[in-house]
UniProtKB/Swiss-Prot annotation:
Binding site for Fe cation 1: H61, E62, H96, E97
Identification of the protein by name: Deoxyhypusine hydroxylase
EC number: 1.14.99.29
Subcellular location, principal: cytoplasm
Family: Belongs to the deoxyhypusine hydroxylase family.
UniProt keyword annotations, A-Z: Cytoplasm, Hypusine biosynthesis, Iron, Metal-binding, Monooxygenase, Nucleus, Oxidoreductase, Repeat
Principal EC category: oxidoreductase
HAMAP family reported for this sequence: Deoxyhypusine_hydroxylase
Pathway membership, UniProt: Protein modification; eIF5A hypusination
This protein's GO CC annotations: cytoplasm; nucleus
Catalysis: reaction(s): [eIF5A protein]-deoxyhypusine + AH2 + O2 = [eIF5A protein]-hypusine + A + H2O
Record's function text: Catalyzes the hydroxylation of the N(6)-(4-aminobutyl)-L-lysine intermediate to form hypusine, an essential post-translational modification only found in mature eIF-5A factor.
Organism encoding this protein: Cryptococcus neoformans var. neoformans serotype D (strain B-3501A)
Keyword Oxidoreductase appears in the UniProt entry: yes
Amino acid sequence: MSVQVSPEQMATLKATLLNTPGNVPLHERFRALFMLKAVGGDEVVDIVSEGLKDPSPLLKHELAYVLGQLLNTRALPTLSRVLENPTGEHCSMVRHEAAEALGAIGAEESLPILRKYMQDENREVRETCEIAVGKIEFDLSEEGKKANANPDFPTIDPAPSAAPSDIPSLRADLLNTSLPLFQRYRAMFALRDFGAGSKEAVEALADGFRDGSALFRHEIAYIFGQLSSPYSIPSLLSRLRDAKEDDMVRHEAAEALGGIASDGVESENPEVVLPEDERLPEGGVLAVLREWAVKADAPTVVRESCQVAIDMWEYENSADQFNPLDSLSAKQEEREKTEKVNTTGMERSAHAAVAAMGIAA
């Protein structure tokens, strides 16, 4: 969607994202970010890049993601600096996202730096660079030039979906650790393409949570957020609750649960007892998110992700779908609840807020 905003509206979005007042809740900054993503253009790239000075790894990781999704080569120097991390200010989660964003933009000039950091000491960074190189090389190939993205999923994926196949074959490739990560990612996204209603595909993806790569596990959780399938809820709960799980996986699991915004479906076999970490407490998924949002001993990234996820949940279940930037909206009272699309809950809410502004071109 192409969006035109006035200078005053752009200034409001910028101030919200960059927390100029000093007291903007994190979830409002996230929504401003995705509203800016809908606007696009060089000025947005500059605003989002400025946000990378923020101390929150969670926000910086999301900023890097958006820079990649904007597909604007103006972001390449910024993303390269984040990956290089000369001052040591960016954690591996942020650097990984910068590498993935370079892959999303797909510029051939990014290949040297990505190949360099395929030797990085951090596994998530190494693996992301490997996948990003694979994506750019694929995009530049004859096969890649002829490939068409799945219109059902409005995102630039780290890897293109593999050729259509049956679920057991794709599951085998997904779990085959002897295959290159890029190939396994292609199987992952091909399984995603079966959609939220395919319990078999969701369960095949959930089997990937046993993989030894945190990067791999976090991508599955992200896909579950895209799909919003109730069948993924037990496995996502397990990842969020596991204190030994990597923070980046728990972060994606939390936000996926917030975007799904339901307690799932009743078991087809009531006699099957779920493992304790997959069971819902009284109050359901929202109670779990609220618990981890205030846990003093929870990692900051996990705690903040749950706070954002609670906002997603409340948005998805709100009759009027609250827009934190109400002052921008000329048609607030005319908004209608939109159907879920295959993207994250935060992006859905941001798109609705942009639509409410009545300025979509």
